[in-house]
């Protein structure tokens, strides 16, 4: 199985900040990388698929980049509603494995 690693498990930022969350695959996944958002109430939403393609209805402040084994999700102009845990998932091969998640919190 392909292992997905998110080295930062939690991240604090201020509203309006630009935040980048990284993800690394144990082998080349040919850009088959998705990003999911899990809100504190448990709601899960697909944000980005195939590295950089924005899912329908997702605000343009979200963007994705990367290639090979290294990928990132960037949130520009952080809003309160973006407070959530973010997971990467590889779709290159079965099983479609997930990273451990990065919890985004507001800096006090």
From Swiss-Prot:
UniProt-annotated stretches for the region Complementarity-determining-2: 50-56
GO cellular component labels: immunoglobulin complex
Family matches, as Gene3D superfamilies: Immunoglobulins
Region (Framework-4): 98-108
Region (Framework-2): 35-49
Alphabetical keyword list: Adaptive immunity, Disulfide bond, Immunity, Immunoglobulin
Location of region: Complementarity-determining-1: 24-34
InterPro entries: Ig-like_dom, Ig-like_dom_sf, Ig-like_fold, Ig_sub, Ig_V-set, IgV_Light_Chain
Record's protein name: Ig kappa chain V-V region HP R16.7
Region described as Complementarity-determining-3: spans on this chain: 89-97
CDD domains linked to this entry: IgV_L_kappa
Disulfide bridge map: 23-88
